[in-house]
């Protein structure tokens, strides 16, 4: 075991696979351009918020200033606890979302979702499409 710095903090091999994956990821982002990725995800986020706002059974938790809001949307449903809704969307509709407190339990105390199990979080990625969002909306409508 190394006893001197910096070897003391790096006694094992470097994670070459992760380093290579990070390099490939950064190369892809540069190739696509951060601006292009941002614009696309912003358009999808705005579309999702607009469509979700049409559903009376859904409550959205959004920032007051949505100018730079992209990719993450938290919601609750009047008929289901977050973990129930996430399970139904996954098992019955093949839609992946996350439920719970999302590593931020104090935020849920602040927004009033602490006792109901948190929220359902939708994460929009670059490879998502409006059809994916429409599938989510159709699933939520079917559950009303």
Where are these regions (language model features)?
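Pyridoxal 5′-phosphate
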Residues: 1-144
């Amino acid at each position: 075991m190394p006893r001197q710095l910096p070897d003391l903090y790096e006694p094992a091999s470097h994670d070459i696979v992760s380093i290579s994956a990070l390099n490939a990821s950064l190369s892809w982002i540069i190739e696509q351009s951060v601006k292009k990725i941002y614009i696309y995800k912003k358009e999808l986020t705005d579309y999702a918020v607009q469509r979700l706002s049409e559903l009376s059974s859904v409550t959205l938790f959004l920032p007051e200033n949505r100018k730079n809001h992209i990719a993450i949307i938290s919601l609750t449903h009047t008929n289901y606890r977050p973990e129930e809704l996430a399970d139904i969307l996954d098992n019955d509709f093949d839609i992946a979302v996350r439920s719970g407190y999302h590593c931020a339990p104090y935020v849920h105390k602040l927004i009033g979702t602490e006792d109901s199990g948190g929220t359902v979080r939708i994460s929009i990625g670059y490879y998502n499409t409006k059809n994916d969002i429409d599938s989510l909306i159709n699933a939520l409508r079917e559950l009303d």
